[in-house]
A protein has these predicted regions:
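Extracytoplasmic gate region of multi-pass secondary transporters
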Residues: 89-141, 202
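A late C-terminal transmembrane helix in Major Facilitator Superfamily
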Residues: 209-246
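Glycine-rich segments within core transmembrane alpha-helices of 12-TM secondary carriers
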Residues: 1-25, 29, 223-233
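A membrane-interface helix-boundary motif in multi-pass transporters
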Residues: 26-55, 237-258
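C-terminal transmembrane helical hairpin of 12-TM major facilitator-type secondary transporters
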Residues: 153-201
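Helix-to-loop junctions at the C-terminal end of transmembrane segments
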Residues: 140-152
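C-terminal membrane-cytosol helix-exit motif in multi-pass small-molecule transporters
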Residues: 26, 54-75, 264-268
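Juxtamembrane intracellular "pre-TM" segments in multi-pass secondary transporters
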Residues: 70-95
Length: 278
């Protein structure tokens, strides 16, 4: 639960950007931060406003870290001990699972605007773009709490993956039928499930690895790998549009990835004879 709250609040940054950036881009503060840039429709965009806005919480965070954050004493570990996590198959399996959760969250956050502009150009979406990331980040602590409640992060992850699979199919159906309510509703369900997966899968890692030092290393490493979703998912969508003039092939790839994650989660962590209770 604590990990979920910490990461969930951090993930809210994506939602806050989507909510505030459209407002800040059109706010004329040229007397303070310089002139705007000409946009395609003849208006002015003040890109620098977003950077200056985020300077305020950044400075505040630095002050709070300086005043209140502690460096906890830890026993020294040899390089061999650190590198040992890369020889453990569970490190890579958890990277796969967490990428399906957090990688999808951050990737869909980055790509949703592109999808709407391509498939539903008649929809004014800028001020609603924050909803998906907001739901995904807000539900992350609940995923960790549920995993603690039923004593099984793998079970929460597995159920969420099945629902995520169904939501992905519904998103594709919404695109093919040109139904924005179906598309957007299914996408919000996708974001909701990524929150559950993120919180529950993070709970799995300490139970799989046992050693607190190794658990912390794997937690950081899986998060770093999963963050590539912000790059890969928009690239997959872009490739599908440029190669096939359709987003469907991209969703076929993502659906196959979700199915593979379901199999991995069940086989290694949730089936009766898996040998690991997490």
């Amino acid at each position: 639960l604590a990990l979920g709250i910490n990461a969930g609040v951090g993930n809210l940054g994506v939602s806050i950007i989507y909510l505030t950036a459209p407002l800040l881009l059109g706010w004329n503060l040229s007397s303070f931060f310089g002139p705007g840039l000409q946009s395609a429709n003849g208006g002015l965009l003040y890109l620098q406003n977003v950077c200056f806005f985020w300077a305020i919480p950044t400075v505040l965070t630095l002050v709070l870290i300086w005043l209140f954050m502690d460096n906890l004493p830890l026993p020294k570990q040899s390089p061999k001990s650190v590198l040992s996590i890369f020889g453990n198959k569970h490190t890579w399996l958890m990277c796969w699972i967490y990428t399906c959760g957090f990688g999808s969250f951050i990737g869909f956050s980055a790509a949703l605007g592109l999808l709407v502009s391509k498939e539903f150009p008649e929809v004014s979406f800028s001020l609603a773009a924050f909803l998906g990331p907001f739901i995904g980040a807000g539900l992350r602590p609940i995923g960790g709490w549920l995993a603690d409640k039923i004593d099984s992060g793998s079970r929460v992850t597995l159920i969420a993956l099945f629902i995520m699979l169904g939501a992905s199919i519904l998103v594709l159906m919404g695109i093919q039928s040109h139904s924005f309510p179906l598309f957007f509703g299914a996408f919000l369900l996708l974001f909701l499930m990524t929150g559950f997966i993120n919180g529950a899968s993070f709970r799995m890692i300490p139970y799989i690895f046992g050693n607190p030092f190794h658990s912390s290393l794997v937690t950081g490493f899986t998060a770093a790998i999963a963050a590539y979703g912000a790059f890969l998912i928009p690239k997959i969508f872009g490739w599908a549009y440029s190669s096939f003039q359709s987003v469907a092939p991209a969703f076929y790839i993502l659906i196959a990835f979700t199915v593979s994650t379901i199999i991995i989660t069940w086989w290694f962590y949730d089936r009766k004879n898996s040998g690991i209770h997490c």
